Amino acid sequence: MNAMLVLFIASALFISEHNTEEVKTTPIPNHQCVNATCERKLDALGNAVITKCPQGCLCVVRGASNIVPANGTCFQLATTKPPMAPGDNKDNKEEESN
């Protein structure tokens, strides 16, 4: 009985080891928002404005919204496309070529 249990566990470990695949990850590219810092400060009219974040990036300031000036970090905005219906792909290509 013990030998059967050991054999079962050994075969399960063997199968598990050979069937697991190494997960391939895509490296995160260095984009314009990496290592970019932004700043929340007052403009000439006394309004809080965000500056120094490249276009396409979002400034995230850690702290209450009433704290001015404050520093933050720029993050790249995700771009997504809405799902297309099966026939939409052909129509979009025709519109782009016109």
Curated annotation (Swiss-Prot):
GO terms for molecular function: toxin activity. Keywords: Complement system impairing toxin, Disulfide bond, Secreted, Signal, Toxin. Residues 1-20 form the signal peptide. Disulfide bonds join 33-57, 38-59, 53-74. Residues 79-98 are annotated as: Disordered. Expressed in salivary glands. Residues 88-98 have a biased composition (Basic and acidic residues). It is found in: Secreted. One of its GO terms (cellular component) is extracellular region. The keyword Zinc does not apply. Complement inhibitor. Prevents complement-mediated C5 activation by binding to C5. Binds C5 at a different binding site than the other tick complement inhibitors OmCI and CirpT1, and the drug eculizumab. Inhibits the complement in human and guinea pig but not in other species tested (rabbit, rat, mouse, and pig). Belongs to the RaCI family. This is Complement inhibitor RaCI1.
